[in-house]
Each structure stands twice: as structure tokens, then as C-alpha cells.
């Protein structure tokens, strides 16, 4: 992975990804450099549009808001039921008051 990170670092810095540049980054990071891996990486990245590859690899965040919307409706229904119970209790109290009033 260090080799890929080195190439991404060079790309984000606007530098050309060459064998010498990758070796320099890896050496600066204290990584023991394998020439064959560096050559393979540079050869594999030749002609690749890294920006396009990053955009394609980036996965959009799944819409998790849809399940959250359903619980928001439930408290509204509970409030309506509570109001109905309060109205029924108030009506019953008023009716009893009329009996004794």
C-alpha cells in the first residue's frame, strides 16, 4: 500500500509519477524500497487518469435518511391520540359537572 500512497502523494502534489520520485517518497518515509515493485507500479499507472480513477472509486454515501423519516411520523400520531384522550376526559368531567351543578 505504501507504493500506492506514494503515487497518490506525488499526484496530489502535481508531480510526475516516476520511478525516482516514488523511490524518493518511500525512502523519505523510511520504507525499504523494492525496485521491482516500483517499476511495476509506474508501468501500471502509465496512461491512467488518476483523477478519474479516484472519482470512480469513490462510493456515494447510502441514503440512510429514509428510515429516519418513519419514526418522525409516529410521535405525531401519539400526540393526536393523547389530545383525543384529554378531550374525552375533559368532556367527561364537564358532563359530571352538569349532573351535580
Swiss-Prot record:
<dbReference type="InterPro" id="IPR027534">
    <property type="entry name" value="Ribosomal_P1/P2"/>
</dbReference>
<dbReference type="GO" id="GO:0005840">
    <property type="term" value="C:ribosome"/>
</dbReference>
<dbReference type="InterPro" id="IPR038716">
    <property type="entry name" value="P1/P2_N_sf"/>
</dbReference>
<comment type="function">
    <text>Forms part of the ribosomal stalk, playing a central role in the interaction of the ribosome with GTP-bound translation factors.</text>
</comment>
<feature type="compositionally biased region" description="Basic and acidic residues">
    <location>
        <begin position="73"/>
        <end position="87"/>
    </location>
</feature>
<comment type="similarity">
    <text>Belongs to the eukaryotic ribosomal protein P1/P2 family.</text>
</comment>
<keyword id="KW-0687">Ribonucleoprotein</keyword>
<protein>
    <recommendedName>
        <fullName>Large ribosomal subunit protein P1</fullName>
    </recommendedName>
</protein>
<dbReference type="InterPro" id="IPR022295">
    <property type="entry name" value="Ribosomal_P1_arc"/>
</dbReference>
<dbReference type="GO" id="GO:0003735">
    <property type="term" value="F:structural constituent of ribosome"/>
</dbReference>
<keyword id="KW-0689">Ribosomal protein</keyword>
<dbReference type="GO" id="GO:0006414">
    <property type="term" value="P:translational elongation"/>
</dbReference>
<dbReference type="Pfam" id="PF00428">
    <property type="entry name" value="Ribosomal_60s"/>
</dbReference>
<comment type="subunit">
    <text>Part of the 50S ribosomal subunit. Homodimer, it forms part of the ribosomal stalk which helps the ribosome interact with GTP-bound translation factors. Forms a heptameric uL10/P0(P1)2(P1)2(P1)2 complex, where uL10/P0 forms an elongated spine to which the P1 dimers bind in a sequential fashion.</text>
</comment>
<feature type="region of interest" description="Disordered">
    <location>
        <begin position="65"/>
        <end position="89"/>
    </location>
</feature>
<dbReference type="GO" id="GO:1990904">
    <property type="term" value="C:ribonucleoprotein complex"/>
</dbReference>
Amino acid at each position: 500500500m505504501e507504493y500506492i500512497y506514494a503515487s497518490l502523494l506525488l499526484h496530489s502534489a502535481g508531480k510526475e509519477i516516476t520511478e525516482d520520485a516514488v523511490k524518493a517518497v518511500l525512502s523519505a518515509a523510511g520504507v525499504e524500497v523494492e525496485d521491482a515493485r516500483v517499476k511495476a507500479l509506474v508501468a501500471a499507472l502509465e496512461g491512467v487518469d488518476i483523477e478519474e480513477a479516484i472519482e470512480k472509486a469513490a462510493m456515494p454515501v447510502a441514503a440512510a435518511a429514509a428510515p429516519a423519516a418513519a419514526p418522525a411520523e409516529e410521535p405525531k400520531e401519539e400526540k393526536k391520540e393523547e389530545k383525543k384522550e384529554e378531550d374525552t376526559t375533559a368532556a367527561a368531567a364537564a358532563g359530571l359537572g352538569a349532573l351535580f351543578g
